[in-house]
Amino acid sequence: MARISGVEIPNNKRVVVSLTYIYGIGLPTAQSVLKTLNISEDIRVKDLTEEQIKNISIEISKYKTEGELRREVSLNIKRLMEIGSYRGLRHRKGLPVRGQSSKTNARTVKGPRKTVANKKK
């Protein structure tokens, strides 16, 4: 397995798919990286030369990936919570942030139901 930007990428997959294993690199970014380096998307990682792998890692280092990107996202969320914006309050309460309804559903964000026992009549 080749190691690019601190991530072991799978050998037996196509290069364009393997690059998406890096946090912050999606399919369009992977395609543009390979296009600038004139590397075919259909080549498997195991067929890449050491020089090509080095060039890919240099090109990817120009992007924010992995820990740096995760840190930036968490700091952005923390900033929203500190300034007391609506989005920050939703993050703090553990509710959907982007305007989704939360009367029913929204279980992924809210977590499992907290059932309350019925009172006897």
Curated annotation (Swiss-Prot):
GO CC annotation, single: cytosol
Protein name from the UniProt record: Small ribosomal subunit protein uS13
Keyword Ubl conjugation in annotation: no
UniProt xrefs under HAMAP family: Ribosomal_uS13
Upper lineage: Bacteria, Bacillati, Mycoplasmatota, Mollicutes, Mycoplasmataceae
Family: Belongs to the universal ribosomal protein uS13 family.
Key word tRNA-binding present: yes
Organism field: Mycoplasma capricolum subsp. capricolum (strain California kid / ATCC 27343 / NCTC 10154)
Keywords annotated in UniProt: Ribonucleoprotein, Ribosomal protein, RNA-binding, rRNA-binding, tRNA-binding
Free-text function comment from the UniProt entry: Located at the top of the head of the 30S subunit, it contacts several helices of the 16S rRNA. In the 70S ribosome it contacts the 23S rRNA (bridge B1a) and protein L5 of the 50S subunit (bridge B1b), connecting the 2 subunits; these bridges are implicated in subunit movement. Contacts the tRNAs in the A and P-sites.
Gene name of the encoded protein: rpsM
Gene Ontology MF terms in the entry: rRNA binding; structural constituent of ribosome; tRNA binding
Pfam families tied to this protein: Ribosomal_S13
Domain of life the protein comes from: Bacteria
